[in-house]
């Protein structure tokens, strides 16, 4: 890679996102060598788990440019290996998730790849489900799993709903390495992509089918009446993530309705104020 200061200058010259540009200029004006080095000493590596890193400006950060580079690499891989490729996309409650989803879908659309997007936050398993249920060529989920709040990530999935193989990851990584984030990424307006049918919304039927499938897998030898009369009480916390609706929906389906949700951790919040490591 180029010198970190050269990379900083290149990014300042090319970045159009105002928030990231402000961060870059502040770095340079402060002469913060530690911050500059940490932001640019490497590029986020793409592997079988995709990308993961802290949010911010630089090659070693999760931002629309590093996400864009990964998406262009994934698009190149899909176009090469699938006829009329399609992708399912989801995001959890982490910060910048919606921005990254729209960035990703717009780039895929510009490459001729149609995206099927969950309109609201969804847990990772629902992305795997949609990829298989809708018979898509791949899937992408914006999530950083258990990492602290400053992180986000970009997980890529194969048509089987599993994380991509090492062979696929290597091919995507090679395509990324040949991609300049400011010159080589194809993109288009997100709303235009929706209007042209290159971005479609995943409807509730897909989630309903998922909930039914999970409920059908429950191990239960009791009748509905026995379940209703059982003194079973649960305490549950979504940890400010995406689990509230899916978990309580499935529990209700199998007859468990007396559920106390921890109020401080009930609602989605990408800052995870009560749980530094969700």
Pin down the residues of each PLM region.
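Basic/polar N-terminal segments that are highly enriched at the extreme N-terminus
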Residues: 1-9
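Short, glycine-/Ser/Thr-/acidic-enriched flexible segments
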Residues: 51-53, 58-60, 94, 122-123, ...
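N-terminal small/polar loop signature for handling phosphorylated ligands or for N-terminal nucleophile
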Residues: 83, 88-151, 253-278
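Long, contiguous hydrophobic alpha-helical segments, chiefly transmembrane helices and signal peptides
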Residues: 46-51, 55, 67, 74, ...
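An N-terminal, well-structured beta->alpha segment
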Residues: 8-104, 111, 193, 199-234, ...
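Residues on a specific face of well-ordered alpha-helices
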Residues: 72, 102, 106, 125, ...
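Alpha-helix capping at helix-to-loop junctions
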Residues: 80, 133, 178-182
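Gly/Ser/Thr-enriched, mixed-charge loops and adjacent short helices
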Residues: 11, 15, 19, 35-39, ...
């Amino acid at each position: 890679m180029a010198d970190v200061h050269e990379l900083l200058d290149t990014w300042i010259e090319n970045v159009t996102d105002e928030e990231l540009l402000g961060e870059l200029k502040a770095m340079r004006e402060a002469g913060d060598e530690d911050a500059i080095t940490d932001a640019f000493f490497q590029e986020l590596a793409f592997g079988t788990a995709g990308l993961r890193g802290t949010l911010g400006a630089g090659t070693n950060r999760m931002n629309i440019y590093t996400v864009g580079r990964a998406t262009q690499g994934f698009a190149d891989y899909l176009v090469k290996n699938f006829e009329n490729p399609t992708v399912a996309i989801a995001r959890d409650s982490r910060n910048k998730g919606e921005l990254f989803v729209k960035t990703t879908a717009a780039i895929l659309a510009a490459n001729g790849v149609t995206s099927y997007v969950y309109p609201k936050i969804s847990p990772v398993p629902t992305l795997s489900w949609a990829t298989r249920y809708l018979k898509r060529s791949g899937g992408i989920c914006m999530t950083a799993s258990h990492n602290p709040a400053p992180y986000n990530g970009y997980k890529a999935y194969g048509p089987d709903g599993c994380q991509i193989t090492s062979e696929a990851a290597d091919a995507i990584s090679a395509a990324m390495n040949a991609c300049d984030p400011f010159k080589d990424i194809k993109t288009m307006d997100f709303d235009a992509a929706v209007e042209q049918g290159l971005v479609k919304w995943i409807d509730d039927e897909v989630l309903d089918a998922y909930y039914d499938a999970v409920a059908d897998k429950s191990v239960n030898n009791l009748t509905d009446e026995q379940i209703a009369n059982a003194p079973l009480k649960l305490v549950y916390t979504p940890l400010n993530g995406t689990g509230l609706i899916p978990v309580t929906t499935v529990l209700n389906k199998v007859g468990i309705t007396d559920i106390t949700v921890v109020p401080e951790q009930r609602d989605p919040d990408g800052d995870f104020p009560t749980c530094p490591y969700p």
